[in-house]
């Protein structure tokens, strides 16, 4: 026992002597640059780069029957250098693993029975680090310092209590040659650092840095690398110190995935309501910016911004064309389907069964001069057909009413003269079947009488003349008949076609006869309608009633309107809530030629607007919306390919389209004599091909009624020494009516004459310049047949028209394709010479046929 203890003491003493000769100083990591302090004692710590397996305490004899194992200290004769530089070089370049005790055993004698093992990655010139002494000296007072109290062979404090050969605390439990804790478990030859990271650099196992080498790549890391867009490949040594921000977060963990997904969702293009842009939208030829944004589920500001980038400065109310809308929608991956706005406003006509037609009452309008008794005549006719006890007599005015006679019903329009009549006609409404022209027997024909005649003739409506006030002593009916005959209204008594009735509205004379004449004229006209179809009519007048809302008087022209029917009135839609007749009584339905007051309209329509009952309320709203858009765009005058009224410049186009059969003119002059002279001069220009019709002439300034008449009749206005005021000019621009001003009569005639001459078909004169006889036919592949000809008269020109004549019958009429003399192309061949002729579009030549060349001269025609 004493010998063995002596041996241990000698071993420890030998190690102490060796340390005196070359003292080993190992500094803590991070204290390499710090100066040693004299106040605190120097401490020897274990180098992190070379962990050594601690030796177990020597057992006593009583613990085991075996002899204790004694490991001799290194030989004192061989000096071993322990330098920090060797550790750095080995750690930074070779990447070697820590040496274990069994790899560094050396006999005391220094022989090589226990060779020192090298790291497979160690360079040949590196210093070999051997293991430390097999036994740590036991401190007499264990514990203290930052490591805490510890017993023999144990560490405390931040490292925790460790059993033999184990490390605790933040490093965790480690097996032999392993590191634990936040650094993770490491195999042999691994460097310490913040855990094992593959593909990194610096401390720990990161490739490309000091002391690093690639770690095995797991499947989870490969998937994460692919998701991040990283290759996961290791970089070369010394080239990864400068890293981008994207490289630093390549493998920062999957906890950021949710954050990036949220960021991505916020950048998705969505609409105002969170709905994505549709794949296809339908727009009209012109669309408002705000409406386009609504259709695409986008904010108006986004659409305006896109248009500004396209070079268009617009606002939400501006209108763009369909092509621009398509380009903008394409930026969002949306297709645009363009539809015609005008077609969307048209209501399809319902098919009628001819067997359902029945006779309908006539619709009559009363016209005439202001003081000739129009209103009195209307009141007399109405009171004669209304019983006083029936709803208190006449209680309201609705603009139209029906009267009962012994022979049938008659509908009268109670409108303020021909002004309303013309206004409705200007909007395209044709509601009147017969016009009653009232003329006072004691006054004669007045200017308003002539205007009423012009309006009635322009509407192509038959006229019945009612000579009123025959009860007065100064009445002269024959004088009235003579004056009206001079204006084209010749009485049947005098061999004409106009019916005259002598009445007295105040004395109720001749009223029944007037009603009979009206019904007789209606029978001649054979007026019919179909009551079994949906209602179709015209708005006579409309107003806003404080108690009932929008109220409109509708004249049903075809079909039957019932309570509850959806409808479209002009640009507004609605559903019939209630209907009233001219007596104010509630009714359930209204048939053809029946005037009714209708409630339930979304707005107040214009007089003369069309009224159509619909099968579906949704369809009615859609048509109403399209008509409102159509009106906003400014195409309200467009209809069936014609978007403007006739002018002197576009008359030729109207003639070709068949939309104009005659030129209608309104003449206004400073004096009546000038107006009559211009009228007579222009009427002489009328021809069977182009007719000129002066629908009205008179003295005075051009007023609004002249413009409305021209608009309704599609006529132009000629002003001679007179002009229109600014208000009338604005109305003419709105109605697209042309006004021409002149100061000399022959200027009027010459300009109208030139315009009408342009409408005449030019005269064509044909001149035969030569003939050729076909004597032989040559067939050439890929070219066709060539006619070998002899010019028999005149000359054949290449630029001339030709016709092929066979047995006196023209087989073909066209142009020459080529003309050759021998093999040369020539422009003409005269009589007596042979030539080769190829006709464009014709190959069926026969020997003996004749080719005739001719020219056509166009001569412009003039009015005589």
From Swiss-Prot:
It is found in: Cytoplasm. Residues 78-90, 239-252 have a biased composition (Basic and acidic residues). Residues 468-471 are annotated as: G4. GTP binds at residues 368-375, 414-418, 468-471. InterPro entries: EF-G-like_DII (IPR053905), EFTu-like_2 (IPR004161), IF2_II (IPR044145), IF2_N (IPR006847), P-loop_NTPase (IPR027417), Small_GTP-bd (IPR005225), T_Tr_GTP-bd_dom (IPR000795), TF_IF2_bacterial-like (IPR000178). Keywords: Cytoplasm, GTP-binding, Initiation factor, Nucleotide-binding, Protein biosynthesis. Transmembrane segments: none annotated. Residues 359-528 form the tr-type G domain. Its main location: cytoplasm. Residues 393-397 are annotated as: G2. One of its GO terms (cellular component) is cytosol. PROSITE patterns: G_TR_2, IF2. Residues 368-375 are annotated as: G1. Pfam families: EF-G_D2 (PF22042), GTP_EFTU (PF00009), GTP_EFTU_D2 (PF03144), IF-2 (PF11987), IF2_N (PF04760). Residues 106-120 have a biased composition (Polar residues). Residues 504-506 are annotated as: G5. One of its GO terms (molecular function) is GTP binding. Belongs to the TRAFAC class translation factor GTPase superfamily. Classic translation factor GTPase family. IF-2 subfamily. HAMAP family: IF_2_B. NCBIfam families: IF-2, small_GTP. This is Translation initiation factor IF-2.
């Amino acid at each position: 026992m004493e010998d063995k203890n002596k041996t241990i003491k000698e071993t420890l003493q030998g190690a102490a002597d060796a340390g005196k000769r070359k003292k080993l100083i190992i500094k803590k990591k991070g204290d390499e640059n710090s100066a040693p302090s004299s106040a605190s004692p120097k401490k020897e710590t274990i180098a992190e780069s070379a962990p050594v397996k601690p030796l177990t305490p020597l057992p006593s004899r009583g613990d085991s029957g075996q002899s204790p194992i004694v490991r001799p200290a290194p030989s004192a004769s061989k000096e071993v250098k322990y330098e920090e530089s060797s550790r750095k070089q080995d750690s930074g370049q070779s990447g070697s693993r820590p040496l274990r005790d069994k790899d560094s055993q050396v006999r005391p004698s220094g022989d090589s029975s226990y060779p020192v093992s090298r790291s497979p990655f160690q360079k040949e010139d590196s210093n070999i680090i051997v293991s430390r002494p097999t036994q740590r000296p036991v401190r007499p007072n264990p514990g203290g310092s930052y490591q805490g109290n510890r017993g023999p062979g144990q560490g405390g404090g931040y490292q925790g209590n460790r059993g033999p050969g184990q490390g605790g605390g933040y490093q965790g439990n480690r097996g032999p040659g392993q590191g634990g804790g936040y650094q993770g478990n490491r195999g042999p030859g691994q460097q310490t650092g913040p855990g094992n990271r593959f593909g990194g650099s610096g401390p720990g196992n990161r490739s490309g840095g000091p002391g690093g080498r690639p770690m095995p790549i797991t499947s989870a890391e490969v998937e994460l690398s692919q998701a991040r867009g990283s290759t996961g490949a290791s970089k070369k040594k010394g080239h990864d110190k400068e890293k981008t921000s994207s490289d630093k977060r390549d493998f920062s963990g999957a906890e950021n995935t949710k954050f990036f997904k949220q960021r991505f969702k916020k950048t998705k293009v969505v609409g105002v309501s969170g709905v994505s842009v549709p794949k296809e939208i339908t727009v009209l030829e012109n669309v408002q910016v705000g409406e386009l944004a609504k259709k695409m589920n986008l904010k108006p500001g986004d659409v305006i911004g896109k248009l500004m980038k396209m070079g268009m400065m617009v606002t939400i109310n501006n209108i763009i064309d369909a092509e621009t809308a398509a380009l903008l929608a394409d930026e969002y991956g949306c297709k645009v389907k363009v539809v015609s706005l005008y077609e969307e406003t048209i209501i399809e006509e319902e098919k009628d069964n001819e067997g359902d037609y029945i006779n309908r009452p006539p619709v009559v309008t009363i016209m005439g001069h202001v003081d000739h008794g129009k209103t009195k005549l209307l009141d007399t006719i109405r009171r004669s057909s209304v019983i006083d006890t029936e709803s208190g007599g006449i209680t309201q005015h609705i603009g139209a009413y029906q009267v009962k006679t012994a022979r049938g019903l008659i509908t009268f329009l109670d409108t303020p003269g021909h002004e309303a009549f013309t206004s409705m006609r200007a909007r395209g409404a044709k509601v009147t079947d017969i016009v009653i022209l009232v003329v006072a027997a004691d006054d004669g024909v007045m200017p308003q009488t002539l205007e009423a005649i012009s309006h009635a003739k322009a509407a192509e409506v038959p006229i019945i003349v009612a000579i009123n006030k025959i009860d007065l002593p100064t009445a002269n009916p024959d004088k009235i008949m003579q004056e009206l005959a001079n204006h084209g209204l010749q009485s049947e008594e005098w061999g004409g076609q106009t019916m005259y009735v002598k009445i007295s509205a105040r004395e109720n004379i001749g009223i029944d006869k007037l009603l009979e004449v009206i019904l007789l004229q209606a029978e001649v006209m054979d007026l019919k309608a179909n009551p079994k179809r949906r209602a179709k009519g015209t708005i006579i007048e409309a107003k806003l009633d404080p108690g009932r809302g929008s109220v409109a008087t509708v004249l049903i022209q075809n079909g039957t309107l019932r309570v509850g029917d959806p409808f479209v009135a002009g640009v507004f839609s609605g559903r019939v809530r209630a209907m009233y007749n001219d007596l104010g009584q509630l009714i359930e339905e209204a048939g053809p030629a029946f005037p009714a007051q209708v409630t339930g309209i979304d707005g107040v329509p214009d007089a003369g607007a069309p009224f159509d009952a619909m099968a579906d309320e949704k369809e009615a709203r859609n048509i109403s919306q399209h008509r409102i858009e159509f009106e906003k765009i400014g195409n309200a005058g467009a209809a069936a390919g014609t978007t403007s009224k006739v002018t002197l410049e576009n008359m030729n186009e109207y003639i070709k389209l068949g939309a104009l059969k005659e030129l209608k003119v309104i003449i206004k002059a400073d004096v009546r004599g000038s107006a009559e002279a211009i009228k007579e001069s222009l009427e002489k220009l009328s021809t069977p091909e182009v007719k000129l019709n002066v629908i009205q002439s008179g003295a005075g300034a051009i007023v609004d009624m002249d413009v409305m008449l021209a608009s309704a009749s599609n006529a132009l206005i000629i002003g001679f020494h007179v002009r229109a005021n600014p208000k009338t000019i604005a109305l003419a621009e709105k109605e697209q009516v042309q006004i021409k001003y002149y100061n000399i009569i022959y200027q009027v005639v010459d300009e109208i004459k030139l315009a009408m001459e342009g409408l005449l078909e030019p005269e064509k004169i044909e001149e035969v310049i030569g003939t050729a006889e076909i004597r032989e036919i040559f067939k050439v592949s890929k070219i066709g047949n060539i006619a070998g000809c002899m010019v028999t008269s005149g000359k054949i020109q290449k630029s001339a028209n030709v016709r092929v004549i066979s047995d006196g019958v023209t087989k073909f009429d066209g142009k020459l394709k080529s003309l050759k003399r021998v093999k040369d192309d020539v422009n003409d061949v005269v009589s007596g010479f042979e030539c080769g002729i190829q006709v464009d579009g014709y190959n069926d030549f026969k020997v003996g046929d004749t080719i005739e060349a001719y020219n056509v001269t166009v001569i412009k025609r003039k009015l005589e």
